[in-house]
Structure formats: C-alpha cells, structure tokens
Amino acid sequence: MVLRYKLPPGYPQPLTDIIGELVALSPAVVVRAPDGRVVQVSADQVVALKTLGARPVASREIRALELAAADAWPGTEQTWIDGWLLRYGDGFTRRANAAAPLGRAHRIGDLYSGETLERLRAWYAERGRALTLLLPDRLGTAPEGWTTGGETLVMAADIGNLTLPDGTSIVEVTDRPGPDWLASYHYRGALLPEPALAVLSAVRDGRVAFGAVRGGAETLAITRAAITDAPDDRRWVGLAAVEVAQAHRRRGLGFLICGEMIRWGRDRGATHTYVQVEEDNAGAIALYRALGFVDHHRYRYATAPTP
C-alpha cells in the first residue's frame, strides 16, 4: 500500500508518503514500512490510500526458492545432469520423482537436442521410473509433443509480515512422524505407500519437523515443516502434508497448526515461508491467503508421449 498523509505545521512540505503493509484502518490508519517502522495516521490526516501492484518475481528468485524447496523435499536420491536436478523417491509424490532445470541458465543442457534428454531418461530408467519434468515458470518449457499437467501454485510470505501465534503452543513437534501422524496423513485420499516414510523424513542440508494437534488420544491436525537455505541467503520454512481430521474441519485448526509451524521455523532462523498447492485446491489456497501468503510462481509437470 502507499499512504499519503498530511504533515503537521512546521514541515517544509505539507504531505508525505509511506509504502508498506496495511496493518489497520480503524480507529487510525496503520502502515508497517519494509524497515519495520510503523506509522499511525488519524483518518482526518489521510489524503490517499492506494494498493500497489505486486512486485514482479525475478527468474533468479524462482530458481532460488525452487532450490530451497527441492532440498526440503529431496526424495531419497538426487543428482545433477547438465544443469538439471534429478530427484528419486521410489514413486512417492511427483516432485520427489522429477527432474527440474534449476542450474544456471547457461549450464542447462538443451533438451531439444536429445542428448541431455536421453541422459535424464536413462537415470530414471535405471530406477524403474519414466522421466517426468518439473518446469517452473520461466525456467523451462516442455519438449514438443509432451503432455503437461499438475499445475501447482507456489505461495510465499516474508515471516516478518505475518501475525503468528504467541505464548505456549499446543502443537506437538517431533523430529520424525509417529504412527498416529502417519495414520492421519492421506496422500491423495489414500493411506501412505511403503516408501512414504523415507521421503517424508528426508531433508538436505536443513531440518525437518512434524507437527500435530491432539485432542485426548485423537490426532486432530498435522503438518510437516522443513527449514532450508536458498542460494540468495534467504532461509525458508516450507509447509507440506497439511491435514485436518474430517470431523474437526472448519474450526481453525489448519490456520493454527500452520501458524505454529511457521513460528517454529522463525525461531530457528527462517525469514520466509512457502507452500506448494495444486491450483484446483481452492480450500487450501484460501487458507494460505488468510495466513498472509501471496502468489510467487507456478510450476507444472511434463511427461513424454506414449510410444
């Protein structure tokens, strides 16, 4: 937001502006500047209050966040081939079993020459998987004839701009998911396959934790959080596997557990937070917007045509 307001007598100019986050509209207009300053202006001194368009996200920022997210969900095996990061997770989740063009642009092999493509295919074939590409905005496009799908929205926030819970937390946080946590997580509506535990527990050069809200012997809500560093020196905490028990939905538990796990990350040095959510999951997107997340970029998957 940009706030223009009147200055008291004695200033050389009658008006001034401040750009920042709108904190409150009543009883006074309150704006928090990027440097943390909070400006409070009575309504009768406000000249204009205008929403600014979102700052465009640079390609380097997309690459940096994708690298941090890949370390937070690395699968069980990773390698680099011609500037492509390949992950393998024994088939559990698409993003843990896909190749992404996350190297520097001049180091990424030319898929359309066929040489790099064949190397990627061979690596996955050795592990019994077909090649799937994960293609973030502006970092890569699908080869001609390939099928794309699974459009995913990456949402992010500066933790300093969020209002997080304070006081004693009711969320139980552990380093590994226990049996109750695993029983509460239904990946794509089904019970977890055998490889899931290794993928859920994996993190590269970071820290992972599993949060749960309990009511007596019942697990009411769960989520996974992982802290990793991006090449631009931002420390991210990423949320995944957010689930609330069917009988306890629409009671604010999703909002609560996400806020608590972001706080867990902040207390361990995280400055930013992100989530990855399929674009047709309207309920989850609404939850994250309510928490303060904004759109960062999108990615999609590409698969080769069937011979």
Task: Identify what each model region corresponds to.
Residues 127-136, 265-276:
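Conserved GNAT acetyl-CoA-binding A-motif
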